Amino acid sequence: MTRDYPRTEWDRAVDAVREAHLLLANGGFDGAASRAYYAAFHALTALFALEGRVFTKHSALEAAVHRDLVKAGKWSGDLGRDFSFCVDLRGVGDYGTEVRVDATQAADAIASARRILVAVRDLLPVNFPPVPDG
């Protein structure tokens, strides 16, 4: 992991939120949910990378969010639920066979991801630039 890795992940998170908005606006609800998840994923990857922690499984990152952020009192339970919601909806968007993500769910996933980005930045504002509006 290079010194620039956390910032690169942060930039990917910001890009993914922007992409999720574009997909939502154009009716790509499954893709919007997936990009929202990856926005949260990259933001959290950036946060944990600053501690020298890298996860090779999505489930390990989700466990770390609940154990090291929520249960440790750094984040509210709502933020943990936001991440789990994004995880679950990504599964529908990427792998669902008989179910699709609808517009409301996609918008909710984007809002959840954005709250996660803001919370990550609030923990370490010197490391990450502000989350753009939109």
Please state what every model-predicted region is.
Residues M1-G134:
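Terminal alpha-helical segments
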